Amino acid sequence: MSKLYGSIEAGGTKFVCAVGDENFQILEKVQFPTTTPYETIEKTVAFFKKFEADLASVAIGSFGPIDIDQNSDTYGYITSTPKPNWANVDFVGLISKDFKIPFYFTTDVNSSAYGETIARSNVKSLVYYTIGTGIGAGTIQNGEFIGGMGHTEAGHVYMAPHPNDVHHGFVGTCPFHKGCLEGLAAGPSLEARTGIRGELIEQNSEVWDIQAYYIAQAAIQATVLYRPQVIVFGGGVMAQEHMLNRVREKFTSLLNDYLPVPDVKDYIVTPAVAENGSATLGNLALAKKIAAR
């Protein structure tokens, strides 16, 4: 049998594990809730043990913060996460000790960003944001992740507040920073403003324009900092069909023709990989890449 590659998308609420071939075709995929580290890792190892004879490598895209510095004593750890029981867990070590193959470790949004570059074969510079329960971003420049001492935390940049939030005294929901992108635009901020879960809020509610205002600011930051070919927005908040055009309109207004960018319909987009599959595709490609070293 030809070589197989593994993908672990380690989310705060669920794990998605998959095995694929050299063409990134998925042969088997499972998902299960993220419970305790012991229980979740045990299920992960059991899944990949079935393919051990042909498994060449595995890539992990994880919730964080995580330590991706291979020279660090805590490389492979989930570090200061607020998720109960998962802080300071040697995630990679606990999984890899049962195998004799290389493992690649990065953030879940980095995996998604990489998957989107694979799906968009002519794109080498891209920023991928997930806008859901939390917010994060992965940035690729010339086919490589950016970052020095560690991964970026784009969800925790401070935002210019929307006038309605100022008027109503809404300061954000992030327990660390309040008025950062995550605190002002992630899913919990919708419910905090309205008392209604996001999926139940009417499309004509002004709260969507507030969300779009903050998400558009993120696109402005990505544009002026990285000058990417494309900015991709995924996650549950952006799954609302009306949101993409709202963000494009706010972005165009805020940028105010300061820099030349592609047509906004080609520049600010949703994922090219269906069914939230960007991270799995990215992980399979990253696993194949490290296996070839």
Swiss-Prot record:
The record ties this protein, via SUPFAM superfamilies, to: Actin-like ATPase domain
- Is Methyltransferase tagged as a keyword? no
Record comment: activity regulation: Inhibition by zinc ions.
Describe the reaction catalysed, as an equation.
D-fructose + ATP = D-fructose 6-phosphate + ADP + H(+)
What cofactor does this chain's UniProt record say it requires?
Mg(2+)
UniProt keyword list: ATP-binding, Carbohydrate metabolism, Kinase, Magnesium, Metal-binding, Nucleotide-binding, Transferase, Zinc
Give the EC number(s) under which this enzyme is classified: 2.7.1.4
State the protein's name: Fructokinase
From what organism does this protein derive?
A: Streptococcus mutans serotype c (strain ATCC 700610 / UA159)
